[in-house]
């Protein structure tokens, strides 16, 4: 009789012990943490260059991803400056630190980078193309869920070129 009770009790205890085990999956990193590269958004902008020959400047930017944190962004861009002298052509790569997170009414940022600069008569100019260091200050104003207005200042080439921009930028949802 004891062996019958033991035979019934052992499988019952084992079933309860197995049911009591709880699966704990490994923690999953949120998509906002760490490095994330890819085309996450783009923007268009226009403005003026207040150097000696004031030029009208048009450009496009790409949001190429985050480095180390969701607040540090990689941003390549291209620009064309027209009127008042030779047309200028600029390709830039900048790193921008955003002081607030996503979804704020205003998002200030600052950063820097470098530009490869040319102009219409670059072939005849021994100093062309040139490399400039950039300082960037700006902020985005929330417009729609994935669109922001952009207001920005660029000090370029040792602050010999001071550019002010206004534009519209988008970022794909996280």
Regions found by a protein language model. Give the residues of each.
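Cleavable N-terminal export/targeting peptides
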Residues: 1-32, 174
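Outer-membrane beta-barrel domain signature
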Residues: 31-33, 47-51, 82-85, 122-128, ...
């Amino acid at each position: 009789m004891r062996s019958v009770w033991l035979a019934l009790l052992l499988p019952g205890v084992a079933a309860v012990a197995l049911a009591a085990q709880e699966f704990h999956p490994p923690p999953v990193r949120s998509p906002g943490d760490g490095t994330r590269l890819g085309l996450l958004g783009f923007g268009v902008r226009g403005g003026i260059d207040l150097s000696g020959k004031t030029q009208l400047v048009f450009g496009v930017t790409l949001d190429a991803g985050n480095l180390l944190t969701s607040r540090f962004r990689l941003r390549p861009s291209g620009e064309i400056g027209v009127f008042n002298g030779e047309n200028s052509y600029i390709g830039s790569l900048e790193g921008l630190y955003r002081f607030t997170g996503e979804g704020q009414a205003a998002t200030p940022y600052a950063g820097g980078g470098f530009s490869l600069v040319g102009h219409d008569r670059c072939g005849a100019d021994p100093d062309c193309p040139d490399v400039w260091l950039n300082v960037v200050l700006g902020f985005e104003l929330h417009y729609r869920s994935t669109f922001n207005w952009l207001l920005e200042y660029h000090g370029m080439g040792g602050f010999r070129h001071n550019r002010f921009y206004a534009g519209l930028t988008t970022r794909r949802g996280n």
